[in-house]
Structure formats: structure tokens, C-alpha cells
Amino acid sequence: MSVQFIRGTAVADLEAPLIQATKQWLEEDAQHEVFYLVPNHIKFEQEIQVLQKLRQLQTTTSDSITSTRLQVFSFYRLAWYYLQHTPFYSADVLSDAGAAMIFRKILVEAEEELQIFRGEINKPGFIQQLFQLYQEMREGNIEIAELYPFLEKQMENPKGQDLQLKFQDLTLIFTRFQLQMSQYGYESAEIIQHLSEYLQTVDLSNVQFVISGYQQFTARELKLIEVLMAQAGSVKVALLLDKQYPHDLPDPRSLFYEAGQTYHQLYQLARQKQIPILSDYVEKKEVLITNPDLQGLNDYWIQSQEHLPPLSTTDWSGDGLFLWRAENVKEELTHVATEIRRLVVEEGYRYKEIQVLTRDLDCYENLLEPIFAEHEIPVYVDRDMAMDRHPLVEWIESLFAIHSYNYRYRDVLRFLRTELFMPMNQLATSEESLTDWLNQRNAWRRKVDITENVVLAYGYEGYYWSQEKDWEFIRYDFEAEEQEDVATMEEESNAIRQSLQRLLPSYFQAMISAKTGLEAATVFYHFLLQSGVATQLKMWRLQAIEAGQLETARNHEQTWDALMSLLDEYVTVYGESSFDFTTFQEIFVSGLEGLHYSKVPTAIDQVQVRAMDLTRPGAAKVTFAIGMTEEIFPQKIENKTLLSDEERQTINDTLTENQYLRGTTGRKIAQEPFVAYLVFSSARERLYLTYPSVKDTAQEVKPSPYFKNIQKDLNLPVFEKNETTIFDDETTSLA
């Protein structure tokens, strides 16, 4: 067993020595295996890259056999690999929405026992904050009971008393949460801890673990790595780091503080366990960033952030680093798209070799895809789409609003416009029925259109929808001086009204009359079937598959599955409890709104669009970092947790080395220059830094101070990009 650190700055290709070590380990013995551990968000890309580089090193046909003994995993995938046939992995894991249900129930039942958090259940976001703190403490390897001696001492000062009272409430809530999870038969999502315990019983002497792409770890992940170092034949850890920190922690102001702290933690763990520590391998030969301008930018940023003497003036070639100022967001994206097309058509780049980074995807997303489509640029937005945009969520919200506001016409129309309420649809979900279903759907849509016109004209609300009597109305054509023929209008609008009247009043009455959560959940499920929701979603999925829209098809399937899982967890938590309709509505609206679709990574030729925080050195040949404004780069960070920065620091000061809460706001702000470093080093050949002069309603938007410093210190031109730009050499200065 041994551990070795692979170090280097962003210019160096740290993967090269890791791939070489992997090849060497696999060739030494036919029984040897390698697990390459990387963050989940880059696992797919990293797996392709590792296998490609390994094949390039292999010289004979037999060498290809070694790749079958190589796995590229995240920590959680590694847990699945080892624990899939154990009770740890077969147990049901509670979803975030299910956890929120349990916390909600505890807060209601324990309201009179709480002191600080009494009544907070109605505060927006409180339950989410509570669950996040619970997860943070579990990941930080902290048991509240371990804090008792410290908290007792805090009674000596007023602030300490508040902290103690807060943790008394948290102790009560978290203890009951764990107890109820056990009672309901749920396994908490602490799979990393179970993996650590399990691997201590496994012979890993033939296994090499390669850990890459991380700068820091949770306390539980550190414990797992400690087990790997003690049990495995070899452990290699790659860190983006300029120097070693075996005995002392780095200066908190250091650009590489997080990685330096991780180095120090792992070094000390290995030393305490008497695990052999090999000499660091510092990569200096293999270069990841090939453009001299970008190499110079890398050196400049390190020098400026480490407060070292400035570098001598660099001769910039002008073909690697570009600074743009656009007239507005639309023009910014238009010029980015134009340049991408030029790079592909004129310079031979592939779309998949280009990435777009932003920290404000909400601002750019609606414009980005249509503008790129206009320029015929295939694009993949690496972002989990929120489920709250799906019509099923709108259907549930409007259904509950109809009950709450007694058939207010705008709620009824929202409900109908989802096109999920289609009770007459009893078609089978086979391919042969798709045409028939489309005809039926179009006929129903036409009736809804007519109904909407009638409702807007006559203002039908309340009992007009719930009564059995059909609508009757007269329309008079004053020009022709005669009554209009409204028979068809009456017939088709009443068909819609009758469908609602036949199902909704009885459904609402059944829900109100339900005695238990199980009874109410059963009523709700049958209503989903009777109103045609399940069939509609199946047909939407089939329609999307026919059109080749596989992601859309998956989204419909995931939405229905998420609703069914939520319903199952509701029955588990509230099934035997007295039914409360208001709580039911809150749970099912917030439960789906907080979920996201899982996306399947793409390997086809597309431009990748992702968050700046998720990039890595050399991720693409070309990077466009857009929206580089002062409001988001550096990011304005606020503490939105249940613990203040002072409380966090106070608690962290009392914990052992293998325990810690996440950093304070100040610590997170101090990480911003490193995020910028990752962005600036994300391109191997070309980097474009851009920002809009006008954004939303804000005039005279200012560039990021990082953008300004680079322009001023390196004396670079800023290219103006607007609708009237003719020549690329139109420049300006920020000075």
C-alpha cells in the first residue's frame, strides 16, 4: 500500500502521469484493477478521455485487454459497485421531498416543545434549510450529541445561550427525523459511510485507486480515502496545486488554499496510519494548455493572486485571448454564435471542442438556443432542467387553485390549457393509436378554445362550473339585426363543462371527506386515471419518441415516476395520520417544484454550455466565458443557512480534525479567484471573455473586476461587438 500526490498548475496535463501509472499497474499483474474516481458531473467525459488516452499508450493487441480492468466512477458509483448486493444498497433511500414531509410532520407535532424554531414551518424555505443543515452535519461527520459539552459552556454569554437553544431544537428535530426514518424503513443517503465500513473488510491489495478532479472533500469522503489508502495496493491523488503542504496549512489567502488544505489533510491521515507516502510527482513535461497567450494568462493570474512581483511584459500574439464588450445580451450571443460558425467552417474546429461558460444561465438560456439554432449550431445545455416547468406541475397547481378559489375562471382555463385533463381519452398507448389520439386531442383542443372564448365573454365562475344545468346564452348580431346561431358553441363548451362537473366536485368532496392520508392518496390516484392524466403522459411520451425527441420523452416519464414516488412516500409518512387537505396541497406542489430531470450526457458533436463553477483546466480547445459582469464575477455570496457565520466558526473551532461544517461566507468569497482561475485555464487554444453593456433593465453594466484587471495589467484591447460592428479591430479601453 502507498499514496502519492500528483501536482501541477492548470497549464500542466495532470492526467498524463495518472494514465501512465494506470497502464503500468494493469500491466504488472493480470489480477490488477484500477478505479478512476472523478466528480460525477465530469464522469462521462472523463471516462471517454481516460480510455482514449490509455489506448494511445497501448502498443499491442493484447494491451487492449487491460482496459476491461479499468473503471471510471464517482464515489457514489463506486458505492453501487461494491454494495449493490448488500442490505445497504437494497434499502429504500428517502428522496428530498420525502425528507421534507417528515420534517414538516415533526415540526407540527413538536411545535410546543420548540423554542427558537417554533412557528418557522410557515416560513418559505425553512424546511429546505433544515434538511440542508442535517445533510451538512452528516457529511461533516458531526453528531449533535458530541457538541453538548461545548454548548453547555456557551451558557456563560448571551450569544452562546441563543446557540445552545438553537441546537436544543435541532437535536429534538434531527433525533426524531432519524427515528422516523428507521420506523418507515428508509435508509438515509449515507452510502459513503457504509462503503467505508464495508471496504475495511475487503482485500484491495490488487486495486489501484486514482482520484482526480477534486479540490476538497467532505469529512465522510476523507474517511473513505483514508480506508482506501490503508486497504488498497496503491492510491494516486491529483491536485491542482503549486507546492506541497505536508506539515503546515497554506495561507487562507492563497489561490490554491482548498487544494493545499486537502493535501495537508490526506498527508496527515496517511502519516498517522503509517501508510508509505511516495515523493510527489510534479508534472512539468506534459502541457495541457498549448497557446502561449493562455499560458501567459495562467502565470499572470497566479502572480497577481499570490501577490508576487509582476511578470515582465509578455508579447501577446493576439490569437489566444480575446476581450469583447457587446451592446446587449442578444448581441453578445449573436457574435458568439457567429464566431463559433467561423471557427468551425474556416479553421476546422469541431463543435464538441467548443464550450460556452456562464454563471447566469437563467438570463441567457431563452435566447441562447434560438440564436444558436438560427446559426445552425448544435448545442447541449449541461443543466438539470427543473420539473416545475412541466404541464403536470401546472395541472396540480391549477387543480388545487380551482378548489381554493371556487372555480375562478383563470384557474379553470390554466387547468384545461395543460391538456392533461382529457377524461374521454381511453385509447390504448400503442403505436397504431397515435394518429387516432392526435385527432381526438385536436378535437378536444378546439372545444377548449371555444370554451375559453365563452368564459371570457360571459365571465363564468363558481357555481356555473359545478352546477348540473348546461350553459345557455344568446349572441345578437346588431349589424344584421338578428340572433347568431350559437348551437355548436353551446354544445362544445358544455361538453367541456360537463367533463369538469362530472369529475371535479365529487373529487374535491371525496378529498375533504377522507379520514386518513392513505384514503386521500387513493382518491387522488384514481382521479389521475379518471381525468386522463396517465394516458395523456404516455401518449406524449410516444409522440416524442416518434419525433426523435428522446429527452422530452424521458422527461414525461420521469415526471410521472416522480409523482408516483411522491405519492408512495406520502402514504408511508402520512398514511395512518388524520388527513389535512391543506398540507396535502403544499406537499404535492412544493414536492415536484423542487425536483430536476436527470440528463443523459451526450457524445455527439455539439457545443457544450455549462456553469462556470463546473469547468476544469483544458476542458475544451475553445472557451467563450460570457456574462463577465461585476454583479456575478466574483459572485455576491450570502449566508442563507440556519447558522450564522459566527456560529459556524465557533462550532468549527471545537471540532476534531475529521469533522467540520462548510466554510463561512468569507471563505466562499475567498474561493472566487480560484473559480476564475479554472475559467481562464479551461481553454487549451482560444479564450473569449465577453460581457454585455446592457442587461435586462440595467443600463451601463460594468465588467467584472477580473476582466478589467486582465485588460489593464496586460494592456489588451477590448473589441466592441454590436449590431453595427463591421470590422473586428474596433476596440476601446476600459481605462
Where is each model-derived feature located?
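ASCE RecA-like P-loop NTPase motor cores
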Residues: M1-H32, A97, R176-A238
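Conserved P-loop NTPase-based nucleic-acid remodeling module centered on helicase motor cores
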Residues: A30-I142
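Structural recognition of the conserved hydrophobic beta-strand(s) that form the central parallel beta-sheet
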Residues: Y36-V38, V72, V210, S234-L239, ...
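Anion-coordinating catalytic cores for phosphoryl-, nucleotidyl-, and glycosidic chemistry
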Residues: S2-T68, A91, N298-A735
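Accessory N-terminal region flanking or inserted into the helicase ATPase core
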Residues: S2-F5, E109-V210, P250-D251, P292-D315, ...
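Conserved RecA-like helicase ATPase core segment
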Residues: L222-F322
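Extended, charge-rich low-complexity interaction segments
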Residues: D96-I116, Y263-K284, N406-E431
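Short beta-alpha junction loops
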Residues: N40-K43, Y76, L240-H247, E283-V287, ...
